[in-house]
């Protein structure tokens, strides 16, 4: 009850104002979330405004927008150059003016995130934006080391589940190959009397 839950709307579910209001309303009702989050900036403030005007607490996203990662050529830091940084800051300002209650800042230089925090008065949380923001966010799989092949620069691993999982699969394959698994401990069995009944039945069927 004391946790503020934000529900990220799926890609393509808020392409128009009417679609955004309809889907956001449904998702809020069904999930019990406290707010919904879109991934759009100043080019889509009309959608943010429409959702907000419908009485739905809405947040948005600046910097790296995962829904648009194909436009960046991959998961890459945004705002490296001053011109790009200005656009990101302007996005944040426009998002606030459109009625959003908060902004996620993702994968931007710490200096840019700090300027965003200065430029807006709404709630901010940062993932890959340095120490700026009202709170810090990390994806669970990054935090526990769920992947070996993909690791964002901003993600510190507090565990290494990937190695544990990989070793478990290797042991499974090895034991299957040498027939040590499955063993009696990990197998179901019938009582001797039931086995006898089964064999008698099968033998009688084979004689027909």
Regions found by a protein language model. Give the residues of each.
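Alpha/beta enzyme core
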Residues: 1-208
